[in-house]
Amino acid sequence: MTAPKPSKTHIGNHALHPETLMLNYGYDPQLSEGAVKPPVFLTSTFVFRTAEDGQDFFDFVSGRREPPEGTGAGLVYSRFNHPNSEIVEDRLSIYEKAEACILFS
């Protein structure tokens, strides 16, 4: 899982409940053509700028190397990570008040 995305946790002095936070947590519309709700990504593979970037991302996701400070591993292959899975993981971690969450089958 990548680091959870920052999200509003209060409105004024009122703390939002986990059920409310889950509605939008972990999703940035600016990264998906401005879609209000997360699209369903029907893909298993993702594009890299260069072959070297692809190799780096596979190394980061598989744990062979640590990604640079402040960056995530990036999207590589859906068996490792996937935009929809990351959103669900982020939202479940909020709901369960956990540091992180992982999906598997």
Q: What role is predicted for each listed range?
A:
Residues 1-69:
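N-terminal glycine-rich, Lys/His-bearing helix-loop that initiates the first secondary-structure elements
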Residues 45, 50-105:
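Conserved N-terminal alpha-helix of the aminotransferase class I/II PLP-enzyme fold
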